[in-house]
Structures are given as C-alpha cells and as structure tokens.
C-alpha cells in the first residue's frame, strides 16, 4: 500500500517537473521605472539595468490610450487580465516579437479603464496570462504620474 502511494507521489513529482514555465513570472530584482519623454511616457516593471521587463505600459501624452505590452514566454493564448484592488479587466492581445526579437503580447486600452484607474489610486496591480498570475509590487506614486500623463 505504501509503495503504491510513494509511486503515485513520485509520478506526480516527475510530471510536475515537465510542466511548462508560467508565461507571467517576475524576477526578484525587478522594480517599476517611469520614463517620461516628449513623445511618450512609459511605465515598466523591469530589471534594474532595464535589459528585461515583465510588463510595459506606455502612452503618448494626453492621448487617452494606453499600450499594454507583456514581455513573456511564447504564448498560445492572447487573453491577458489585469487586476487592481478588486477591479479586473481582460484584454485580447496580439502575439508578436519585440525590438530585441523577444516574444511579447501587446494590446491597447483606454486611460479611463477601471483597472488602470484603480492602479493609479492604489499602486496595486496583478497580471494574469495562460492560467498564471503575478502580483507586482506597489507603485502608487509612479502609477499616478503615469496615468496623469496619459489622460486627455
């Protein structure tokens, strides 16, 4: 009996090790960075050197539109959800390649999106893709500045 249980546990562990890596996964050293320029403002959750990012939000100043880019492992599904303090929105994203030929999912939403409004108020943001979620550290001040630059 115990051998059957141990064999089952071993098989489950072996199968678990073959599971695909989550599409959404942050490195421990990642942090938010806000990059305002004359033509575009970008809020990125990235490594300190800026060489790898998980999520980028960008907009032309006062355009009312926000571009969402999820820097992720190649994904078969292009449905991404963002959640902030109880608000949740889903976005149909386009799979493609970024400037460094890295896989990305990209889409556009309005600066008036309820999730982005809550993100600006609370700094709380969680990203979901392909059944996996990643809570990002609070960034209220940077989120508020970013959203203020995007609103009409």
Residue ranges with predicted function:
Residues 1-7:
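Bacterial N-terminal signal peptides that target proteins for export
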Residues 12-15:
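Bacterial Sec-type N-terminal signal peptides, specifically the leucine/valine-rich hydrophobic h-region
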Residues 19-21:
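Bacterial signal peptide processing site
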Residues 26-47:
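Post-signal peptide N-terminal segment of mature Sec-exported envelope proteins
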Residues 36-41, 74-78, 119-124:
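A short, compositionally biased
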Residues 47-76:
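Short, surface-exposed binding/anchoring microloops in extracellular/periplasmic proteins
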Residues 76-89:
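Extended low-complexity, serine/threonine- and proline-enriched intrinsically disordered segments
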Residues 88-152:
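Internal interaction segment
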């Amino acid at each position: 009996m115990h051998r059957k249980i141990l064999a089952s546990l071993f098989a489950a562990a072996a199968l678990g090790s073959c599971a695909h890596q989550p599409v959404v996964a942050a490195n421990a050293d990642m942090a938010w960075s806000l990059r305002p320029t004359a033509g575009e403002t970008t809020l990125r959750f990235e490594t300190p050197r800026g060489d790898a990012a998980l999520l980028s939000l960008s907009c032309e100043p006062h355009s009312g539109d926000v571009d969402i880019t999820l820097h992720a492992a190649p994904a078969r599904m292009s449905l991404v959800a963002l959640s902030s303090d109880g608000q949740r929105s889903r976005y149909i994203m386009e799979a493609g390649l970024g400037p460094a030929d890295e896989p990305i999912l990209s889409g556009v939403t309005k600066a008036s999106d309820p999730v982005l409004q809550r993100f600006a108020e609370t700094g709380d943001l969680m990203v979901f893709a392909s059944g996996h979620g990643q809570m990002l550290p609070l960034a209220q001040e940077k989120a508020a500045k970013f959203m203020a630059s995007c609103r009409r």
